[in-house]
Amino acid sequence: MRTEAERLLKLYSETPGASGNEELVRKVFCQELNGHAFSADRTGCVLAARDGDPKDGPRVMLTAHMDEVGFMVQNITKTGFIEIVPLGGWWPHVVLAQGVIVMASSGRAIPGCVAS
């Protein structure tokens, strides 16, 4: 049986959110905050708060960013290979043979694998 933390980690890490396209991650995150106080600003930042008693311990702030390593399709070859360019920083040596999800402009998720 999975813990709530494991469920959330799986949900967030499997939600597509390449740099500049974090809308789906933001939507999933806000859905999970249902019932808790939160707000979102025009830049896409989500702020959430949970009331507590100061006598219970120190205040804690958690911060994270929603985007992940991503690529943009530059070209599709005649043989069907997709040529990509990175969005943000990445390490080329860890990408080979990794599974990817190609998000079509229609919103369709297409599974793939990085080849050399």
Task: Go through each PLM region and give its residues.
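N-terminal hydrophobic/helix-forming segments and targeting peptides
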Residues: 1-116
